[in-house]
UniProtKB/Swiss-Prot annotation:
HAMAP family: Sulf_adenylyltr_sub2 (MF_00064). Signal peptide: none annotated. This is Sulfate adenylyltransferase subunit 2. SUPFAM superfamilies: Adenine nucleotide alpha hydrolases-like. It comes from Erwinia tasmaniensis (strain DSM 17950 / CFBP 7177 / CIP 109463 / NCPPB 4357 / Et1/99).
Amino acid sequence: MDQQRLTHLRQLEAESIHIIREVAAEFANPVMMYSIGKDSSVMLHLARKAFYPGTLPFPLLHVDTGWKFREMYEFRDRMVKNIGAELLVHRNPEGLAMGINPFVHGSAKHTDIMKTEGLKQALDKYGFDAAFGGARRDEEKSRAKERIYSFRDRFHRWDPKNQRPELWHNYNGQVNKGESIRVFPLSNWTELDIWQYIFLENIEIVPLYLAAPRPVLERDGMLMMIDDDRINLQPGEVIEQRMVRFRTLGCWPLTGAVESEAQTLPGIIEEMLVSTTSERQGRMIDRDQAGSMELKKRQGYF
């Protein structure tokens, strides 16, 4: 394929499809992480393109904390049913037994037990040797230096000083027993690329990405949308309706909304063209401490 004859988005698409096919051919038991967000939706769309008209040759995996937005769960179940994919859902049973939640135990412990440990449990349980993720290099500085094939040891830990070179489009997938890789087909995409591709391909997304009047309160410097009754209001807090949307999605107590009037995909793209802040500014887990994302990845986080 002559890359010079392709548009920017089609070049990114071709690269991602090549990576997905390469992993499917090279590894014995791959899986695709499905977190229900915009990047996961694009990655799933690319995977379906990669193997069309056949079905996906690997299952989807959702590591569920029990604290996602209700609209995310509804979207997940509908999407999986519509495309006929196999979905595996894993919740950390020890975390559930301990009643771990972001309000009582804080974002760091909640993320470590319900997401990081939950992910490692699921990968071990099913014996996956490769796991696709939707992370992009423009999101955060630790992800900017991570390879497309991110190697993990038998404890799922990432060592940024022990990464293999990736020359041109050649990827080294050799792993020893117990080791695995995390694969990031969207590494070279930007947030703007993602939205332009969603618009171009008419990819369905969770409605929370579009601006609408929603019940929110201000806490810890972010706008928290109240999604159910598991919250206790602090003195002086008031729930009010505001026109907001989300640039990134996660557990609802840990994900901040942004005030916006963008009710359509062109409106979101217009916002992205003038935005000077990271989409992860609304993720409470990234504020735990300096370099917290890299520390999480060293411990096994995606």
